[in-house]
């Protein structure tokens, strides 16, 4: 058996880091088991689904390093779903209902008042052909419900009916079908809700493992019933915990702030995003994996907590810094060249500055510092200005090396009596225009004598 998984986003918005957790969990599981990963767009809602969102999802996944083995669009598979609908109708497992939303709400409230479970009472099963024809003559169109197998012979005499599965994350799970309403699979306009196309596609595409958020746990009992009704063996299920904001709110496509695209535009490394999306809320320590192979070594569905995990942007910042601080020059080189940072001093420049980067794009600023003019003149007080002028008069001749900074500052200390912060801070401001940054012993060599002299206030 070839392990086959799928990620099935709805292209009705941009995916966020919570969706990323699901996509990466599936992709890593397939990778570790020499399996296949299917990207399947749940675009049956033709009004809300947009091609621009589908394209954005593909770009986001590619940026994260997730490359599907197969791409499918549910909107192109309606004929297959129609055949499944007819099969269920023929078996007497899909029945027409005509209630409006208001009528269903009144019935729900009535059941609650009688202290009955607020589930659909299957009233539509009692309709005669004449009553159905009369309702349709009024202009009503039916929606179609799946008849859950929670009874023996009388569908109005429901009884506890347990569905069991061994969840890859949560262990043994049980849901009671008697506590649920028969799910609507087909809307009045003939379009399909999520449940039916999902099951039909999983069967048709040979999906063996379904890994998704734990907000789908209850759905699983229904879907297992539909798998069996269509004559298929249900796949293995795994439900990971969900990510929330730091305040505990659920993530949503509508918020946008934590969309993968916005994180990319903010300059985060893809492996910082991937590492946090996978390792947060697990028993594993949250560290920055340098690549997908390393992340796969830490990926274990059994290590996932059953409680939701809070996404803290500060953790993402820390992981991003860690990746940049540990990134070897050979890995950074193509990206540096794309920014015009090349030549004989490119490697020594990277080694000098990468330990101070928050974002990779910060290198452009430091390259300007060592290779061009300062973005703006440093703000030095009169006393510090005089001190820096004196210090620059003591600059040693070239050639310079890693010891030049030490020998120069020792000479300045002897000549001026300044030491510590009072000595180093004015020199740093004059040389770089910044109060903080990479080691000046490394930067000074890169700036060079002539450019350093040009920065004499």
From Swiss-Prot:
Molecular function GO labels: ATP binding; glutamate-tRNA ligase activity; tRNA binding; zinc ion binding
Species, as recorded: Brucella melitensis biotype 1 (strain ATCC 23456 / CCUG 17765 / NCTC 10094 / 16M)
The name this protein goes by in its record: Glutamate--tRNA ligase 2
Keyword Secreted: no
Family: Belongs to the class-I aminoacyl-tRNA synthetase family. Glutamate--tRNA ligase type 1 subfamily.
Presence of the UniProt keyword Kinase in the record: no
Motif residue range(s): 'KMSKS' region: 250-254
Xref: InterPro entries: aa-tRNA-synth_I_cd-bd, aa-tRNA-synth_I_codon-bd_sub2, aa-tRNA-synth_I_CS, aa_tRNA-synth_I_cd-bd_sf, Glu-tRNA-ligase_bac/mito, Glu/Gln-tRNA-synth, Glu/Gln-tRNA-synth_Ib_cat-dom, GluQ/Sye
Described function: Catalyzes the attachment of glutamate to tRNA(Glu) in a two-step reaction: glutamate is first activated by ATP to form Glu-AMP and then transferred to the acceptor end of tRNA(Glu).
GO biological process: glutamyl-tRNA aminoacylation
EC assignment: 6.1.1.17
Record motif 'HIGH' region, residues: 9-19
Keywords: Aminoacyl-tRNA synthetase, ATP-binding, Cytoplasm, Ligase, Nucleotide-binding, Protein biosynthesis
Reaction it catalyzes: tRNA(Glu) + L-glutamate + ATP = L-glutamyl-tRNA(Glu) + AMP + diphosphate
Cellular compartment(s): Cytoplasm
Superkingdom, natural source: Bacteria
Amino-acid positions noted as binding ATP in the UniProt annotation, renumbered to this chain: 253
Subunit structure: Monomer.
Lineage: Bacteria, Pseudomonadati, Pseudomonadota, Alphaproteobacteria, Hyphomicrobiales
PROSITE patterns to which the protein is assigned, alphabetical: AA_TRNA_LIGASE_I (PS00178)
UniProt cross-references to NCBIfam families, sorted A to Z: gltX_bact
GO cellular component entries: cytoplasm
């Amino acid at each position: 058996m070839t392990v086959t998984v799928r990620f099935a986003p709805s292209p009705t918005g941009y995916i966020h880091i919570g969706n990323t957790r699901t996509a990466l969990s599936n992709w890593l599981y397939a990778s570790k088991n020499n399996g296949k990963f299917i990207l399947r767009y749940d675009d049956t809602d033709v009004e809300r689904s947009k091609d621009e969102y589908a394209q954005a999802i593909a770009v986001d996944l590619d940026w994260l390093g997730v490359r599907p083995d197969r791409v499918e669009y549910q909107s192109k598979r309606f004929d297959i779903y129609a055949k499944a609908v007819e099969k269920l109708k023929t078996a007497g497992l899909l029945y027409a209902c005509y209630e409006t939303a208001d009528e269903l709400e009144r019935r729900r409230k009535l059941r609650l008042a009688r202290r009955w479970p607020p589930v659909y009472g299957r009233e539509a099963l009692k309709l005669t052909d004449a009553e159905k024809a009369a309702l349709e003559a009024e202009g009503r169109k039916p929606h179609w419900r799946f008849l859950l197998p929670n009874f023996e012979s009388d569908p109005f005499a429901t009884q506890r009916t347990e569905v069991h599965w061994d969840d890859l994350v949560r262990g043994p799970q049980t849901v009671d079908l008697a506590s649920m309403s028969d799910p609507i699979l087909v809307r009045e306009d003939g379009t399909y809700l999520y449940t039916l196309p999902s099951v039909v596609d999983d069967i048709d595409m040979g999906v063996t493992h379904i890994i998704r958020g734990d907000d789908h746990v209850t759905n699983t009992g229904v879907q297992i019933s539909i798998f069996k009704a269509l004559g298929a063996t249900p796949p293995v299920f795994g439900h990971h915990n969900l990510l929330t904001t730091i305040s505990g709110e659920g993530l949503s496509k509508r918020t946008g702030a934590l969309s993968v695209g916005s994180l990319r535009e903010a300059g985060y490394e893809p492996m910082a995003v991937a590492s946090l999306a996978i390792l947060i809320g697990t028993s594993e320590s949250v560290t920055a994996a340098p690549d997908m192979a390393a992340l796969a070594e830490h990926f274990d569905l059994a290590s996932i907590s059953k409680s939701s995990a809070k996404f803290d942007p500060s953790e993402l910042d820390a992981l991003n810094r860690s990746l940049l601080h540990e990134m070897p020059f050979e890995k950074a080189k193509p990206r540096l060249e794309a920014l015009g940072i090349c030549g004989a001093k490119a490697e020594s420049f990277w080694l000098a500055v990468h330990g101070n980067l928050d974002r990779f794009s910060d290198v452009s600023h430091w390259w300007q510092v060592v290779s061009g003019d300062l973005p703006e003149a440093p703000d030095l007080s009169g006393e510090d200005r005089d001190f820096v002028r004196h210090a620059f008069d003591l600059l040693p001749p070239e050639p310079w090396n890693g010891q030049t900074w030490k020998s120069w500052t020792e000479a300045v200390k002897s000549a001026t009596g300044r030491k510590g912060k009072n000595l180093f801070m004015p020199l740093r401001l004059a040389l770089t225009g910044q109060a903080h940054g990479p080691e000046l012993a490394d930067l000074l060599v890169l700036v060079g004598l002539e450019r350093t002299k040009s920065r004499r206030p």
